[in-house]
Curated annotation (Swiss-Prot):
One of its GO terms (biological process) is lipopolysaccharide biosynthetic process. Belongs to the DegT/DnrJ/EryC1 family. ArnB subfamily. Homodimer. GO terms for molecular function: pyridoxal phosphate binding; UDP-4-amino-4-deoxy-L-arabinose aminotransferase. Catalyzes the conversion of UDP-4-keto-arabinose (UDP-Ara4O) to UDP-4-amino-4-deoxy-L-arabinose (UDP-L-Ara4N). The modified arabinose is attached to lipid A and is required for resistance to polymyxin and cationic antimicrobial peptides. The keyword Lipid biosynthesis applies. It is an enzyme of class 2 (transferase). This is UDP-4-amino-4-deoxy-L-arabinose--oxoglutarate aminotransferase. It comes from Photorhabdus laumondii subsp. laumondii (strain DSM 15139 / CIP 105565 / TT01) (Photorhabdus luminescens subsp. laumondii).
Amino acid sequence: MDSFLPFSRPAIGDEEIQAVEKVLRSGWITTGPQNHQLEQDFCRMFGCKHAVALASATAGMHLTLMALGIGPGDEVITPSQTWVSTINMICLLGAEPIMIDVDRHTLMVDAQTVKKAITSRTKAIIPVHYAGAPCDLDILRGIAQEAGIPLIEDAAHALGTRYKNEWIGEHGTAIFSFHAIKNATCAEGGLIATDNNELVERIRCLKFHGLGIDAFDRQIQGRRPQAEVVEPGYKYNLSDIHAAIAVVQLSKLESMNIRRRQIVARYSTALKDSPLQMLSVPDYEHIHAHHLFMVRVNKDVCGIDRDTLMERLKNKNIGTGLHFRAAHTQKYYRDRYPQLSLPESEWNSVTLCSLPLFPDMSDDDVDRVTDALQEIISEHR
């Protein structure tokens, strides 16, 4: 049998290993010069005004919501069809997540659905750039500006994504992820990009105990003046070990995304006549980062359900993923919102399947996946 083909595998080479070794030998391994380098490189690459490196994108979401003063009695609009961390952070701040449905074919939030969900208690709107494609930001920004509500972009899937003439993260506030399966990784990490001067100052303060200055800053200043707590904060800083990996990964991002694009093109050609339904791409100008390649497995059309298909692929040593089961179908949120019905999110939750996609995949790997899919489906039709 062929060796196991994972759903994702980080493209780590000698450069990343050497970068980590350099940090380990430097004598300074926590937040320091590599974090500053990462933030500077990110701003240079994507044209953003400020970048704040953090321990995770979840930490970034938490700090951004907190910096905006969101708390009990407030509402935050976001799709249920996303990773649960966003909804979790809203709840942990005592606010109410207003989970809305998405377009069945793109998994993007619909602008009119967002507009209808706005109330006098709405304090933020969080759209998700899904699978590497951008939301229609012009319309969403217009709605947010008209209502006087901050727009926070969940850009965990959108590293290297462009919307019309701008990079995601170039304008407004966007939160990125360097998790192990992302387009650029440092195992665990995240970053907030923003052009809001006041917001970034509060985020920088909150990320490290509310001190407003990190350990490296204090070290190079000889710990004078002594830092003081401005307000209670968290410990969400990123180590330089992780940042060093991210710096190298960012330098490779363009080439890695090009390879992702080639893999997706090969998948798309092989599966164009398949009963598996691929995601539709937006009809406005954009550059797709191809973080995920997903198909929908509709049993009525394919003769097999998603879970059975994933199990059959596993038996052939092919890994898959699920991105995502809608948050409102998870136990805690089912119990909290028993009447909430979001048909498009629910349909996608039981049909979505993410196929292997990572830069080091060979064309033979792609063909192995598509051949296996066609073989399995042909047995059930």
